[in-house]
Amino acid sequence: MSANEDQEMELEALRSIYEGDESFRELSPVSFQYRIGENGDPKAFLIEISWTETYPQTPPILSMNAFFNNTISSAVKQSILAKLQEAVEANLGTAMTYTLFEYAKDNKEQFMENHNPINSATSISNIISIETPNTAPSSKKKDKKEQLSKAQKRKLADKTDHKGELPRGWNWVDVVKHLSKTGSKDDE
């Protein structure tokens, strides 16, 4: 079989195997993503496999550069890719996309044993908090809220409901009053 026929057969098999699986995503007929782990799992990661023109005789391109993997350190990513590359070399010449995804699912805990989540929000807040002491003493002025009297507060509370929203229909026009002002066509 030619490489193109092998790819078509594997593509058909992947579509039937992963039909309805939310973790699997077909980016193009030669590029696939699979999320290993659940959505909220801090040890979840995303693998992208792209086939070359001569795949499966040549190895596919493996990638973990997806935005989903931003919390994973580059050392852990390199470790995962190295282990997947070993599996690629063992399966060279055969359809291996499903095998690689399953291998990653089976070895997820081993792959992520050295994983310490990088929290980008924490690192940004650390940068901000480092810069804040320099600017904080110079701006001690606080913005004052508008002070309302009791009567103003009561009037505002009467207009709004318990959520602070205006009631439904507060700007509706009284139909009878409106029509009496405009008159009918017979009056002209």
UniProtKB/Swiss-Prot annotation:
Protein transport recorded as keyword: no
Gene3D superfamilies in UniProt: Ubiquitin Conjugating Enzyme
Segments forming domain RWD: 9-111
Biased composition (Basic and acidic residues): 155-166
Source organism superkingdom: Eukaryota
Region called Disordered, residue ranges: 132-167
UniProt keyword annotations, A-Z: Acetylation
SMART domains membership: RWD
Modified residues (N-acetylserine): S2
InterPro entries linked to this entry: RWD_dom, RWDD4, UBQ-conjugating_enzyme/RWD
Name by which UniProt lists this protein: RWD domain-containing protein 4
Native species: Homo sapiens
Lineage start: Eukaryota, Metazoa, Chordata, Craniata, Vertebrata
Name of the gene encoding the protein in the UniProt record: RWDD4
